[in-house]
Amino acid sequence: MSQSDLESSMRKSVEATQRNFNTIRTGRANSSLLDRISVEYYGAETPLKSLATLSTPDSQTIQIQPFDISALALIEKAIAMSELGFTPNNDGKVIRINVPPLTEERRKEFCKLASKYAEEGKVALRNLRRDAIDKIKKQEKEGEFSEDQSRDAQDSVQKTLDKFIAEVEQHLATKEADILKV
């Protein structure tokens, strides 16, 4: 695995962690809160984003405008059944969700969830490091690398890991500050 391949894989892992962070409520309306909702539409699980336009007309409201009005009730049901705790308001044309302010207890729960996502991201990064170092050691055994080259390559992999873990930590700190801001 080349250095650029490793960095690319680690970048994707950090981006996946960032997407997970985006699904956590911060007290303000954000359409990405609904990213994980899928709707049973014509017998298939379909992502909400594929069925409707999501917008945030103000800081406390998410508006969902379905492309097909017949999907309105299905979308409403999927949101109500989700773990987000939102109550959708259906007016026959659009669905509006009022995002209530977070309680202190919910803020702490969401901070814990953000920490969990960050830890999962770090584990994924460490797994990539382990795979890269295993390949380097294998190449050293096969004689492709000298001992010094192997050590240098392993140090480079570790420095790359440290850089990306620091990035995950920075994203976590930003998200926690966002969650705790009243």
From Swiss-Prot:
GO terms for cellular component: cytoplasm. GO terms for biological process: translational termination. It comes from the Bacteria. The keyword Protein biosynthesis applies. Its main location: cytoplasm. Pfam families: RRF. Keywords: Cytoplasm, Protein biosynthesis. The keyword NAD does not apply. It is found in: Cytoplasm. One of its GO terms (molecular function) is ribosomal large subunit binding. InterPro entries: Ribosome_recyc_fac (IPR002661), Ribosome_recyc_fac_dom (IPR023584), RRF_sf (IPR036191). Belongs to the RRF family. PANTHER family: MITOCHONDRIAL RIBOSOME RECYCLING FACTOR PSEUDO 1, RIBOSOME RECYCLING FACTOR. Responsible for the release of ribosomes from messenger RNA at the termination of protein biosynthesis. May increase the efficiency of translation by recycling ribosomes from one round of translation to another. This is Ribosome-recycling factor. The gene is frr.
